[in-house]
UniProtKB/Swiss-Prot annotation:
This is 7-cyano-7-deazaguanine synthase. GO terms for molecular function: ATP binding; ligase activity, forming carbon-nitrogen bonds; zinc ion binding. The gene is queC. The keyword Hydrolase does not apply. Binds 1 zinc ion per subunit. The lineage of its organism: Archaea, Methanobacteriati, Methanobacteriota, Methanomada group, Methanococci. Its EC number is 6.3.4.20. It holds the Pfam family QueC. It is an enzyme of class 6 (ligase).
Length: 233
């Protein structure tokens, strides 16, 4: 069985790729260049994880997105919330809007669907999850359901997108990741890269952007040793 894993190199997509591997899928991974500030680090991380999982890795250029995106992920204007802001819906929604890239997931998953159909893969694995679904509308079960409905008309082999993490929050994802590492006898989590920034050194996280803060909290609440190096602990 063939599958495509959309792999940014982050915690969610790394765990999702391990999950697909654990289900004996022959996986290929895709990383998208949409002009993000952390692009080089994401590619290095995704390539390393792909090598560990024995998966073909592909980088797909959708750099045109930055021509109309005002997202902090493209401009570098990254919000740095406080810990107590992470569960404040209004503040989290404001942060979400600051890093929202127009139609990014729709574009990426559509291209991944074409890739999957072209190589005869039956599934696309994505790292969409419960915690990010609170504020990001394209991380919700409703998005997955409606996207799959469009694939019934947009592909001949009825490719489907699956999101094995959609009922999990970040601590649960970190815990699952550790369990999968043990099951597969592989080290993956320490090579994942969640930071919105490029901090000039491989796998080095800033520790202050929202993505880093959620990552730190995930490992802490899961009771798992955090393998991540941060500029600000």
């Amino acid at each position: 069985m063939k599958a495509i894993c959309v792999l940014s190199g982050g915690l969610d997509s790394a765990v999702t790729s391990m999950f697909a591997k654990s289900k004996n899928y022959d996986i290929s991974t895709v990383t998208f260049n949409y002009g993000q500030m952390a692009l080089n680090q994401e590619i290095k991380s995704a390539k390393k994880i792909s090598d560990i999982l024995n998966a073909d890795h592909h980088v797909i250029d959708i750099n045109f997105v930055k021509e109309f995106s005002k997202s902090g992920l493209n401009t570098g204007n990254i919000p740095e919330p406080e810990n107590e802001d992470l569960d404040d819906f209004e503040k989290s929604e404001k942060t979400m809007k600051a890093v929202w890239v127009p139609a990014r997931n729709m574009i990426m998953f559509s291209i991944a669907s074409g890739f999957a159909e072209g190589i005869g893969a039956e599934k696309i694995f994505s790292g969409l999850n419960k915690e990010e679904g609170v504020t990001f509308p394209d991380n919700t079960p409703e998005f997955i359901e409606r996207f799959n409905k469009s694939l019934e008309y947009g592909t001949l082999n009825k490719v489907k997108m699956v999101a094995p993490l959609y009922e999990l929050n970040k601590p649960e994802i970190a815990k699952l990741g550790k369990e999968l590492e043990l099951k597969l006898d592989l080290e993956v989590l320490k090579y994942s890269y969640s930071c919105y920034k490029d901090n000039g050194k491989d796998y080095l996280h800033c520790g202050t952007c929202e993505s880093c803060m959620r990552r730190k909290r995930a490992f802490k609440e899961a009771g798992i040793t955090d393998p991540t190096k941060y500029l600000v602990e």
